[in-house]
From Swiss-Prot:
Name the UniProt record assigns to this protein: Ecotin-like protein 1
Lineage: Eukaryota, Discoba, Euglenozoa, Kinetoplastea, Metakinetoplastina
Family (UniProt): Belongs to the protease inhibitor I11 (ecotin) family.
One Gene Ontology term of the molecular function aspect: serine-type endopeptidase inhibitor activity
PANTHER family: ECOTIN (PTHR35890:SF3), PTHR35890
Domain of life the protein comes from: Eukaryota
InterPro entries noted in UniProt: Ecotin_sf, Prot_inh_ecotin
SUPFAM superfamilies: Ecotin, trypsin inhibitor (SSF49772)
Species assigned in the record: Leishmania braziliensis
Length: 146
């Protein structure tokens, strides 16, 4: 990973939040603009029965992008629901006593611009985790009509 300096005056985390900061590897301005995207995947590790864990779980919430005034440095603010929504398939017939822990992600995780000029700064609830993916596309292709 690259080491970009955190020079912009990012806000402090609120008392019920934490701030996560990490750097992205430089890919070149053109490639970062045209080919790369960052997907922030916030969520929580929840304890649930084996039956619930076998179902698809999601959290509602949002990711809002903001900019440090006068700097142009982006940062993100995550809001997450406390309770997960889930499919309701009965998978195991036993009594649901056995518990497991499972990462449950925000249901809609948009792709945001990739930039190595500034650190990625994300504010999220203290009990949440942040995972991320980096997406890379190839050359643009032209669709043709028949």
């Amino acid at each position: 990973m690259s080491c970009c300096k955190m020079e912009a005056p990012y806000p402090h985390a609120e008392s019920d939040e934490k701030r996560i900061v990490f750097a992205l590897d430089p890919k070149g301005d053109d490639a970062e603009r045209d080919q790369y995207r960052l997907q922030l995947i916030p969520g929580r590790v929840l304890e649930m029965s084996r039956n619930d864990a076998a179902n698809h779980q999601t959290l509602s919430g949002s990711i809002e992008q903001h900019t440090v005034e006068g700097w142009g440095a982006p940062f993100f603010h995550v809001k997450l629901a406390k309770e997960a929504a889930a499919t309701l398939m009965q998978v195991h017939s036993e009594d649901h006593v056995e518990k497991s822990r499972k990462f449950v992600a925000l249901s809609n995780t948009p792709l945001v611009p990739y930039t190595s000029r500034y650190p990625v700064v994300v504010y999220l609830p203290k009990d949440a985790e942040l995972r991320y993916s980096i997406w890379c596309g190839g050359e643009q292709m032209q669709a043709t009509t028949e």
